Amino acid sequence: GDWCKPEDGVFGMNESPRDCPQIECIPCSFYGNQPLVYFYPKLAMSTMRAYINYMTYDGAAPWVFGGCTARSEPSGARNERHLPTAACAMNVPCRGYQTTTNGISFVAMADRLWVSSGYDQEILKELYPWVKKNTIYTMTLRAEEGPDGVVSMPTGNVGTEWFEHCQWKGIVAHVGGLHLAQLRIAERMAEESGDKNFAAMCRMWFDEGSKSMEKHLWNGRYYINFFEPSTNEKSDLIFSYQLDGEWITDFHGLPYCFPKDRVQTALATIREVNSRHSDIGFLSFLNADGSPASGGEGVMKDWYDPFAFFNAELFMLAMNYMYEGQVEFGLPLAEKCMNSIVCKHLHTWDMPNMIRGDTGEVTFGKDYYQMLMLWSLPAAVKGQDMGGPTREDGLVTRMISAAN
């Protein structure tokens, strides 16, 4: 369309050329676009402008620009007109089946461009209206449930989230935290844009969602996986990556996502139950007694290996510990994972998506740019927000200076 300027073009990353060929799968870019923002911000802005112009009329961020999972239905049902799309298609966007978490991926990437630019007001002016539009869409996906809906799966529990091969129902710890983080980002942008009314709405949604999670999910040791109020069905599994929302607020230099004492207690629980199973990473799901959750049953359905974890998620969890003052634990956790991938299993230029925590063997994925999440670690090691490395004497500033 006319929005695509010759000087911009459309820049997009391929999720995995050999295993999942598609352009700009939005959670993959959430995990992996930080070095683009640091070193090639014009390319990152080109991608962001495509996300904006591919956004649906009601505010849904696009799932992909095109490729092997191009689908039009949040349920995951394929639309036949999308099936022939090439792996490198750039003009067949759809809202996909992770609608409840596509929003934080989009909003976080927008905020990265703004924060890393030194809070450039022109960038804020261009991006904020779309952050607002998507935030309204995301927070009303289950509007009929009132405050609980802010931290719940969409109406009817339709679709899935980043951990897409699992059951998610009702109020969900992982989704809830991501939504609360999105509200923190949107509130700051609204305040800086002079949109006081929307900033107040974000605070209201945040307060309501936070109270709902504390009431229904906190059990004294961790946030249980999910609770469906309409049926009283719940999953009390320990989801090791339940604090992703907290990492986002830390990395973006924002106030807490979860109460501080809850974060510290949950991290201690997650560390304790995983220590007996793996030296190189944390299992995704464990039973309440700390044993590995069985694959093929209940929440895990039939896809994830009980000992498997996503490497990019492990890096975020390692940074959770760093931001809580435990650099001596968090940094070696990330290092052990990379040592296993690169030195033991020799995937130096072939970054996998998931590995087993007990053996380090790859369970899925080749050439995954999610692994560029590594570029978020320098800020976390120093306890800085993402803008730290771009400031005077920061790592990114020094690298660019050396290259010039």
Residue ranges of each PLM-predicted region?
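Active-site core of glycosidic bond-cleaving carbohydrate-active enzymes
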Residues: 24-56, 129, 176-177, 181-192, ...
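Glycine- and aromatic-rich loop/turn segments at beta-sheet edges
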Residues: 2-17, 58-71, 81-90, 140-167, ...
